[in-house]
Design a protein with these regions (language model features):
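Pair of pore-lining "gating" transmembrane helices in MFS-fold secondary transporters
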Residues: 65-85, 163-167
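Helix-to-loop junctions at the C-terminal end of transmembrane segments
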Residues: 8, 118-132, 214-215
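Helix-loop boundary and gating motifs at the non-cytosolic
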Residues: 84-97
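C-terminal transmembrane helical hairpin of 12-TM major facilitator-type secondary transporters
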Residues: 133-176
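Juxtamembrane intracellular "pre-TM" segments in multi-pass secondary transporters
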Residues: 35-75
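A late C-terminal transmembrane helix in Major Facilitator Superfamily
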Residues: 182-219, 225-226
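Symmetry-related core transmembrane helices of the 12-TM Major Facilitator Superfamily/SLC fold
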Residues: 15-33, 221-238
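Loop-to-transmembrane helix entry
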Residues: 95-115, 190-194
Length: 243
């Protein structure tokens, strides 16, 4: 994020795109050559074969009959929808008075992702001490609190809100995706792929809607909409039961 902003200021959008592409290629090569071999891997028939299709369809039916998985997939949808919406449009708020940040300063907002990395690592601790459902509820409440703080015209309070929001999103995502794997024993890969499809669909669906809200009503309406979305996620957790 930071390098692309720096490249855009010096070489334009083409330079920024080239920078991102090169870093992506380097990361792919590192992943290919540094990843250790899979452990406890068991090959299965591809869905293209008759046996594979039957196995895939049977697994899918089993997963779709679990209401808790539907809840977790929906929470993933709502979580990333909120997250992408905030980071898509917070820059427009910060470039306006009373903040009037430069492009380089706006790029530095993504340093707050550091809190997300710490939160993801702490999600296991949260699950052990509070249970996955309670921890997920706490993270959704923290996400809402962070959103409300971004309404402030104080840069310190706004950044605190962004930090809390980011922490809560990454921890919530880690908790929800982990719960999907625990629920879908024997079919974790398929359940996780559905979760990810729902997760990214949330970004695709909510991002443009929030953009229209920003264009018409500005930041307070954006926050109101996203607090409602997070509140829906919080209500859905009640269907998960204690865990």
């Amino acid at each position: 994020r930071l390098l692309s902003v720096w490249a855009a200021e010096h070489w334009g959008s083409e330079g920024a795109a080239l920078m991102v592409g090169l870093w992506g290629l380097l990361a792919a090569l590192c992943f290919l050559y540094c990843l250790p071999p899979s452990q406890q891997f068991r090959a299965r028939a591809l869905p293209l074969s008759r046996v594979g299709r039957q196995a895939w369809w049977s697994a899918l039916q089993k997963l779709l009959r679990d209401p808790a998985l539907w809840v977790l997939w929906a929470i993933g949808f709502l979580l990333l929808g909120c997250f992408v919406s905030v980071y898509n449009y917070i820059g427009f708020r910060l470039e306006q008075p009373p903040f009037a940040w430069s492009a380089l300063a706006l790029g530095s907002v993504f340093l707050l992702y550091t809190f997300g990395g710490l939160a993801s690592a702490a999600s296991g601790w949260m699950t052990r001490h509070w249970g996955s459902v309670c921890a997920l509820q706490l993270m959704l409440l923290t996400l809402i609190a962070g959103l409300l703080l971004t309404l402030s015209d104080s840069v310190l309070l706004l950044l605190l809100g962004m930090a809390l929001f980011t922490l809560a999103f990454f921890a919530g995502h880690a908790l929800a995706s982990s719960a999907v794997g625990q629920r879908a024993r024997g079919h974790q890969a398929l359940a996780a792929s559905i979760y990810l499809c729902s997760y990214y669909a949330g970004a695709s669906a909510l991002g443009p809607i929030v953009g229209l809200v920003w264009h018409g009503q500005h930041w307070s309406a954006v926050v109101a909409l996203l607090v409602f979305v997070a509140g829906v996620g919080l209500m859905l957790t009640k269907r998960l039961g204690p865990a």
